[in-house]
Amino acid sequence: MAEIKNYTLNFGPQHPAAHGVLRLVLELDGEVIQRADPHIGLLHRATEKLAETKTFIQSVPYMDRLDYVSMMVNEHGYVMAIEKLLGIDVPVRAQYIRVMFDEITRVLNHLMWIGAHALDVGAMAVFLYAFREREDLMDVYEAVSGARMHAAYYRPGGVYRDLPDAMPQYKASKIRNAKALSKMNENRQGSLLDFIDDFFTRFPKCVDEYETLLTDNRIWKQRLVGIGVVSPERALNLGMTGAMLRGSGIEWDLRKKQPYEVYDKLDFDIPVGVNGDCYDRYLVRVEEMRQSTRIVKQCVEWLRKNPGPVMIDNHKVAPPSRVGMKSNMEELIHHFKLFTEGFHVPEGEAYAAVEHPKGEFGIYLISDGANKPYRLKIRAPGYAHLSTLDEMARGHMIADAVTIIGTQDIVFGEVDR
């Protein structure tokens, strides 16, 4: 009698649970995965190569488009690498603004993750709830930079501009009556900081809501507990970082272990898992949202009390003010040179890493003294995590592969770069 062979199945790239353009070639024995082979490159846009043809400042918007749900954190790694090479110190107010927006971005990312992960597993409501909160945070992005997603707000030497004193309000339209309008604009009467403060006062209750729906939910636990278990040793050897590593019980967070900006002045905790399964990683990320809330609250408090510059006053790197430019010839020349030729960065190399919502996001930058990078290497956390999929999915069912892709929080912009 002929023996039954394993059969091969293509998962994606046109698949709702494939998180973009993931293509998996699965080798199955019945419904059990024997091997999972990720095929990447379907969203490759040559970001690293493009950076070699652009001035240092022109590449900032490209960073937004790497992991397109954690926009500002990508920029942060890039501008930190440039600042290391230039040897410049960023004003403290700008550092607090950066840290605040890093944490807002972390919450944005985790809201997207919890919504998509739950939807993949079969829970619909959390997805809608998460997007309700994301909307407010997108408005914060828009208030400060003019764009809801691709902000290009961080610049070498600081941030693009200080926080606005007023929050944009909803306007009257045919579909909104006066009562609805006044309710929508209720928390938008003050400054941007007031709005952020109001949001993060409400937000812990929202996180409790998600936990009510998921944490003790029988079906959720059946789908996540004991799935994709990674031991602490394997997690380290596989190059995992971020929530994936902490879910396996290793307390490693760049914000604590290699503090950058003002993280060493802030009070927060690092959540750590025990079993290293999908459920633990879920709990770690939910707790991270609570810790981000603490950090943002501290930043808001500090920013209210301490006005000051948000950009260095070295006009070789940072553009001069509009007012100065109209009255001073030198400043006009600086402005012209900056936006045509860009600034020249001293010869050398630098590596800057930030604690990205998905793990360690690193930028390795080599300069040959020109106005463009000689080479830019992006260390994307999702790339290392996706390569562990084969090991994590082996011996599980097809349905569990969806859970494992969800727990890895894969975004293809950064995997393919």
UniProtKB/Swiss-Prot annotation:
One GO cellular component term noted in the UniProt record for this chain: plasma membrane
Q: What PROSITE patterns has UniProt attached to this entry?
A: COMPLEX1_49K
Task: Return the Gene3D superfamilies for the record.
Answer: Cytochrome-c3 Hydrogenase, chain B
Instruction: Using the UniProt record, give the first listed, main subcellular location.
Output: membrane
Which InterPro entries does the record match to this protein?
NADH_Q_OxRdtase_suD, NADH_UbQ_OxRdtase_49kDa_CS, NDH1_su_D/H, NiFe-Hase_large
One GO MF annotation is: NAD binding
Where would you find this protein in the cell?
Cell inner membrane
Chemical reaction(s) catalysed: a quinone + NADH + 5 H(+)(in) = a quinol + NAD(+) + 4 H(+)(out)
Cell inner membrane among keywords: yes
User: How is this protein positioned relative to the membrane?
Assistant: Peripheral membrane protein
Keyword Transmembrane applies: no
Key words of the record: Cell inner membrane, Cell membrane, Membrane, NAD, Quinone, Translocase, Transport, Ubiquinone
The EC category is translocase
Q: What is its EC number?
A: 7.1.1.-
SUPFAM superfamilies, alphabetically? Answer: HydB/Nqo4-like
One Pfam family name is Complex1_49kDa
Q: Which family does it belong to?
A: Belongs to the complex I 49 kDa subunit family.
The protein's matches in NCBIfam families, at most eight in alphabetical order, are given as:
NuoD, PRK06075.1
Q: What does this protein do?
A: NDH-1 shuttles electrons from NADH, via FMN and iron-sulfur (Fe-S) centers, to quinones in the respiratory chain. The immediate electron acceptor for the enzyme in this species is believed to be ubiquinone. Couples the redox reaction to proton translocation (for every two electrons transferred, four hydrogen ions are translocated across the cytoplasmic membrane), and thus conserves the redox energy in a proton gradient.
- Oligomer and partners: NDH-1 is composed of 14 different subunits. Subunits NuoB, C, D, E, F, and G constitute the peripheral sector of the complex.
Name the UniProt record assigns to this protein: NADH-quinone oxidoreductase subunit D
Q: Which organism is it from?
A: Paraburkholderia xenovorans (strain LB400)
Q: Which gene encodes it?
A: nuoD
